[in-house]
């Protein structure tokens, strides 16, 4: 074991057998990530839970009694946080979640295995919600091709679809948060969000890996109807 720049012991993984270099690097990153270890100790499904916790601690949008939609929920870190903070675990608030992958049950969360981009997915989600939403969360990420420009366009297209859904289901004053990547390709998205919401900002939580271009667009104060 070696020490990293903070003085912590760093775990290294040997490449052997059928393990690819990319798998080795991913495993090393997981083993040396303090948020991964902390998530296990705190009972969160993933390190992503801390990103939502940080954002809510600062901006206070997850309030008791609110209804939340979590798009791209698996393995469930964000759904866990949302369910606790809006009181869904006690039947006060509501959390509805979907993902392409199966997700083990979480107390207070209604889950369906759905592809958000399927034509009938929004209708199914609305039926699950049994009413409007106060918050739409999206930690979805498109499959990457390795071609940077193509990947940027894919993720922006996914976020634009999530934003359009949010505009259909959010109650006035609602909040929309989605994962994006710093690229400059989201100019049109920001224009639309600024029409529909009173405040739009980019947020990069401390728990988001610093070597990643990942950040979140946070739109608050939904106007109720798009501004003309």
Swiss-Prot record:
Gene: rlmE
Binding site for S-adenosyl-L-methionine: 76, 78, 99, 115, 139
Predominant cellular place of this UniProt entry's protein: cytoplasm
A Pfam entry, by short name: FtsJ
Enzyme Commission no: 2.1.1.166
Entry superkingdom: Bacteria
Keyword entries, A-Z: Cytoplasm, Methyltransferase, rRNA processing, S-adenosyl-L-methionine, Transferase
Cellular compartment(s): Cytoplasm
Function statement: Specifically methylates the uridine in position 2552 of 23S rRNA at the 2'-O position of the ribose in the fully assembled 50S ribosomal subunit.
Phylogenetic lineage: Bacteria, Pseudomonadati, Pseudomonadota, Alphaproteobacteria, Hyphomicrobiales
Catalytic residue list: 179
N-terminal signal peptide: none
Annotated Gene3D superfamilies: Vaccinia Virus protein VP39
A GO CC term attached to the entry: cytoplasm
Catalytic reactions of this protein: uridine(2552) in 23S rRNA + S-adenosyl-L-methionine = 2'-O-methyluridine(2552) in 23S rRNA + S-adenosyl-L-homocysteine + H(+)
Protein name: Ribosomal RNA large subunit methyltransferase E
Principal EC category: transferase
Family: Belongs to the class I-like SAM-binding methyltransferase superfamily. RNA methyltransferase RlmE family.
